[in-house]
Design a protein with these regions (language model features):
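Short aromatic-glycine motifs in intrinsically disordered, low-complexity regions
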Residues: 2-14
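HotDog/MaoC-like acyl-thioester-processing domains
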Residues: 29, 98-101, 108-140
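Active-site helix/loop of acyl-thioester processing domains in fatty-acid/polyketide metabolism
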Residues: 23, 55-78
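Extended beta-strand/beta-hairpin segments
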Residues: 12, 37-39, 106-108, 120
Length: 140
């Protein structure tokens, strides 16, 4: 289990844009499982949407990307590097994420070639899939 301070030793994102709270498990270069505890005080709820707060799909996707970054940047050869989006494919949003939800984030690296790769990403709450798709990344 990694806490936020340990996560910051692997990925470069910082508050308020650090979108994962803890990493349950990870295998360098292969996979990672993380959690985002969705708090009612999150900065984005002020405008998305007042009176009906919903976590934006793009931020669910970013949370998944940061989870995948833990897997790929924890490789010794990628220390002190960054993982950038190369593309988002087949991303589907199935349920809303709201304050109080515990968002489970799972990413499995399914393809790697040089600095490029693809991760299969699934976000879920209470065992129900809220989003899934493929994230292409480049390590720089």
């Amino acid at each position: 289990m990694l806490n936020k301070e340990e996560i910051k030793k692997i990925i470069p994102q910082r508050e308020p844009f650090l979108m994962i709270d803890e990493v349950e498990e990870f295998t360098p270069g292969e996979s990672a499982t993380a959690y985002k505890y969705v708090d009612e005080k999150e900065w984005y709820f002020k405008g998305h949407f007042p009176g009906n707060p919903i976590m934006p799909g793009v931020l669910i996707t970013e949370s998944l990307a940061q989870t995948g970054a833990v897997a790929i940047l924890s490789l010794e050869e990628n220390k002190n590097k960054n993982a950038l989006f190369g593309g988002i494919d087949k991303m589907k949003f199935k349920k809303q994420v709201t304050p109080g939800d515990k968002l489970k984030l799972e990413v499995k690296i399914i393809k790697r070639k040089g600095p490029m790769g693809v991760g299969e990403a699934i976000a879920s709450c209470d065992g129900k899939i809220v989003a899934r798709g493929e994230l292409t990344f480049a390590v720089v």
